[in-house]
């Protein structure tokens, strides 16, 4: 499969200034020579050096149908590690598709989803964590999320894991020498040294794991349920955060009967907002179904904005909502602070991570909530240039490694002998190799690259 030369559109679909068709494989230059004629008759595609460009016309047979630029990369100095030619044509979809068809007629094969990055991984140009970062940086729609992905693409995570593996490998070599060659004069490792090395690795893994949720919020966004009694100001809040009138707002209680969805950017976090039906007792079947969905969204959400009417006394529904929010990442918004307060905040405050007095009709509320959400979800503590875990695969591998290191520490402290410590260190090293992809099975590799689209 990897011996074939592949072609695909590498740019996003739709009209644009340019489109890029990428060739990769041993016959890239030969295929390019059949579909591209340099404007300078003294230039030949086959002779082009790496990191050079030629202007010319794109051909279908002998007929020119567009003009543009060919960029040349010689193996191994390319994205995939193979000979690569990138053909930049005008950005109309029809032109780009025709250029791909010409490349296929000239001997290239259609690229599979993620095949370019897969080849980069298999050819040693990227680690598996760097390959995953390619997808993260493509998907990123916030500055911090893009910075985290770029740090991983630049090798921050791979270098961090390599350093921890180096510490464990050196320790394991000493353990193996002492266990396997007891007759030799190998000094036994003292517990203090074991605690220092293993404790240091465990601390680094703990930091990566603890920062995972905040990093995931920056990369992927978070589902946020807006809940509260009728007329507390939920839909007004949704409209404020969205920046336009997304939901109908009236003085009539029960106006919102179904879940209203809207994605918004709050600071550097994408919130998938769900404005829900007002929570109250009702005999209306339609409204009751909306309220059932409100509770369901609260249970599913990664963030809850509970809106209370600060101008009215606390009700049974308010207290029930507060109890439901206990232990969740939830912020109580005491709305209508521009009116005399009748609400007893002290009763509900213990159930929330934060309590904010707000006015959902004032623009300053948006900034206030943005800051509170960043603090609650920990995104304000993230160093966007530091190593970070991305995706459940990396988290699971890091967690296995951390548990194995903790097991080694427990074995050393419990006097179970260096054999037991050595087994745990082996398990930790295996987990770290799984994380970086050194031990990755074909199934794991397939799972990583199936998220990619054609051309990446």
Q: Residue locations for each model-derived region?
A:
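A glycine-rich (often HGG/GG-containing) alpha/beta subdomain
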Residues: 1-147, 151, 155, 331
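C-terminal-of-GTPase-core extension/linker across diverse P-loop GTPases
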Residues: 2-9, 13, 143-265, 282, ...
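Switch I (G2) and immediately adjacent beta-strands of P-loop GTPase domains
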Residues: 55-65, 70-74, 254-282, 300
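Short glycine-/small-residue-rich Rossmann-like dinucleotide-binding loops
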Residues: 242, 277-278, 302, 309, ...
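Short, Asp-centered acidic motifs that coordinate Mg2+ and/or phosphate
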Residues: 271, 303, 331
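Generic enzyme active-site microenvironment
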Residues: 273, 307, 333
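Inter-motif core of Ras-like GTPase G domains
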Residues: 287-311
């Amino acid at each position: 499969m990897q011996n074939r030369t592949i072609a695909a559109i590498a740019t996003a679909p739709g009209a644009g200034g340019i489109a890029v068709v990428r060739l990769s494989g041993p016959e890239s230059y030969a295929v390019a020579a059949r579909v591209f004629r340099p404007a300078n008759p003294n230039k030949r595609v086959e002779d082009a050096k790496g990191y050079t460009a030629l202007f010319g016309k794109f051909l279908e047979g002998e007929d020119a149908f567009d003009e543009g630029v060919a960029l040349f990369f010689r193996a191994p100095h390319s994205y995939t590690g193979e000979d690569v030619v990138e053909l930049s044509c005008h950005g109309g979809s029809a032109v780009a598709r025709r250029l791909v068809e010409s490349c296929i007629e000239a001997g290239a094969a259609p690229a599979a989803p993620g095949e370019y990055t897969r080849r980069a991984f298999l050819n040693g140009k990227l680690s598996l964590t760097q390959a995953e970062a390619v997808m993260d940086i493509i998907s990123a729609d916030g500055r911090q999320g893009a910075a985290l992905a770029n740090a991983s693409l630049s090798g921050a995570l791979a270098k961090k894991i390599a350093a921890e593996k180096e510490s464990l490998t050196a320790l394991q070599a000493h353990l193996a020498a002492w266990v396997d060659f007891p007759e030799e004069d190998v000094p036994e490792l003292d517990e203090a040294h074991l605690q220092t090395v293993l404790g240091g690795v465990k601390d680094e893994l703990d930091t990566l794991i603890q920062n995972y949720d905040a990093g995931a919020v920056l990369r992927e966004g978070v589902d946020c349920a807006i809940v509260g009694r009728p007329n507390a100001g939920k839909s007004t809040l949704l409209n404020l955060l969205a920046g336009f009138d997304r939901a109908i707002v009236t003085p009539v209680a029960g106006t919102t009967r179904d879940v209203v969805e809207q994605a918004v950017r709050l600071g550097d976090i994408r919130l998938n907002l769900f404005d829900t039906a007002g929570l109250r007792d009702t005999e209306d079947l339609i409204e009751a179904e909306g309220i059932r969905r409100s509770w369901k969204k609260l249970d599913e959400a990664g963030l809850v904005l509970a809106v209370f009417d600060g101008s009215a006394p606390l009700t049974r529904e308010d207290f029930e909502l507060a109890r439901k929010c206990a232990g969740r990442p939830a912020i109580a918004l005491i709305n209508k602070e521009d009116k005399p307060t009748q609400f007893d905040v002290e009763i509900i405050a213990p159930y929330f991570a934060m309590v904010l007095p707000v006015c959902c009709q004032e623009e300053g509320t948006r900034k206030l909530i943005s800051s509170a959400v960043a603090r609650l979800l920990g995104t304000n503590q993230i160093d966007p240039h530091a190593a970070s875990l991305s995706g459940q695969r990396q988290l699971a591998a890091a967690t296995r490694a951390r548990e194995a290191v903790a097991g080694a520490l427990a074995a050393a402290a419990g006097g179970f002998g260096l054999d037991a410590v050595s087994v745990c260190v082996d398990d930790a090293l295996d987990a770290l190799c799984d994380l970086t992809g050194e031990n990755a099975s074909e199934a794991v590799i397939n799972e990583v690259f199936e998220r990619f689209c054609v051309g990446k």
